Design a protein with these regions (language model features):
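Non-heme di-metal
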Residues: 1-184
Length: 184
């Protein structure tokens, strides 16, 4: 087997790191939410996030490499700009993080020269992200309505989208430096 491209291993390690941090965010939500339906959905969502981290770990191992420790990943960079303190903020951040994961994986599907196994992982995690975005958004809107102002949900999402745009721009610049404009 040919040695894996270290740039690809680094990129897949970033994906793995994002999924692990996503699981951590869901653990916070599990502790904050008493709603039985939310507890069921959060448990499945947490299962998905840790499974995604495992799928990236396995893909890296199958390529003959080891996952890299990522110290400047997406959620670490978001955390340097803000720490959500309310349930609405954590839900809004989760919506934005899931949207970013979905769009990032979609982009990877079209821009990188993917082998069959990497394509399979990308398709599997992308499919799960659709449900993650939908149910968290609905729960966020429901809680905002219960608190008397649904517009709080959209305002929180917009707040985190602005932070996401800054963070993603920096990560994208790094990816362009590594892979070049045509792939990144």
């Amino acid at each position: 087997m040919a040695e894996a491209d270290p740039r690809l291993i680094e990129l897949l390690s970033y994906y793995r790191d994002a999924e692990l941090h996503g699981a951590s965010l869901l653990m916070r939500l599990i502790k904050l939410m008493d709603d039985p339906d939310a507890q069921v959905k959060l448990s499945l969502h947490l299962h998905d996030e840790t499974r995604h981290a495992w799928l990236w770990t396995k893909r890296i191992n199958d390529l003959g490499a080891k996952p890299m420790k990522i110290s400047d990943g997406y959620q670490t960079r978001v955390g340097l700009r803000t720490v959500p303190r309310t349930l609405l903020d954590i839900l809004a951040l989760t919506v934005v993080v899931e949207e970013r994961s979905f769009s990032r994986y979609q982009e990877h599907l079209t821009k990188h020269d993917n082998d069959e196994q990497t394509l399979a992982v990308l398709k599997e995690v992308t499919n799960d992200e659709k449900w993650h975005m939908a149910w968290i958004r609905l729960k966020l809107l429901e809680i905002a309505r219960q608190q008397g102002d649904e517009s709080k949900a959209e305002a929180a999402i917009e707040k985190y989208r602005k932070i996401d745009a800054e963070v993603y721009a920096a990560l994208k610049a790094k990816e362009i430096a590594v892979f070049g404009e045509s792939v990144a």
